[in-house]
Amino acid sequence: MSARLEGLDSALRRRWAARVRRLAPWIIPFIASALIAGCASGPREADPSAGLIERMASADVVLLGELHDQPGHHRVRAQWLEALAERRSITIVMEQLDQRRQPQLDAERARLVESETLSARARRVAQAAGFDFEGWNWSFYRPVVELAIDRAIPLRAGNLSREEAMAIARGQAHRLSVKVPSGWGPLQESLLRASITEGHCGLLPDSMIVPMVSAQRARDAQIAEVALSAQASGRLPVVLAGNAHVRRDYGIPLHLSAAAPDLKVLAVGLLEQGQPGNPQAYDAVWSVPPIKRPDPCEALRARFAPRPAGSVGMPAR
């Protein structure tokens, strides 16, 4: 009986061996492909921003700076926003939107238009919130608005209205009831003046710098107020603004600390590699390769150049 079983077992092994030989041309590539796929789906190269994202996720308020014309900054911020939205309930606060038009923003966002694309809807919402399509590059900010709509993320307008900005330019900042933060002093005043002077190539007269200092301080106070409102609702506010606004020494963090000293604020400056600046002004810095851009001072030099005798009107803008 045992011999018969052994003979049967031997016959079965020979039969299966023959089948394997016939199928080998198909089986071996399949196994190889599976092994390769397994390697490809294994651990990827570590994301260099992963640690920074975790720091953002543990904060009470996140401030992300930018150079307005740097596409690399906008790309990485959009990636961070998506990653943060996976970890926390966030609210996006944008410097580019008019805070007084928040009701219009909300109304347009809630209004559905048949067959409207996400891109068209995002543009309609931004327009309702006072986005300046001539002053800002919409292609940089569209992905943020689209993300907010697509993922049902609250979107808050953070900036002063045009009317408020004009009031400040006329020296009427007192009409806005903007409080000077407790940490504001001569050092902060001089740093902000120096930043504005340098940003305008040293061409601005003092008569223009003074209201611009007041305007930026008012903008920072306004954005801080919006961020605090979002944070009080239990969400993580993520503020998108220029680097000067997110600086710890004279920007939004100063206003946040004055209003809520225990708030955990993370200010991230987005710079270009080799860019002169003060990395210590931020809690973290992210640098990207620089882009080529025309001399920004040329237009200002033309604007403030002495006019020929007998000419009338303002220099061309």
Regions found by a protein language model. Name each.
Residues Q70-V76, Q99-E108:
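Membrane-embedded segments
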Residues R87, Q104-A232:
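A substrate-binding/cap region within the structured catalytic cores of diverse enzymes
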Residues L52-E86:
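Zymogen propeptides
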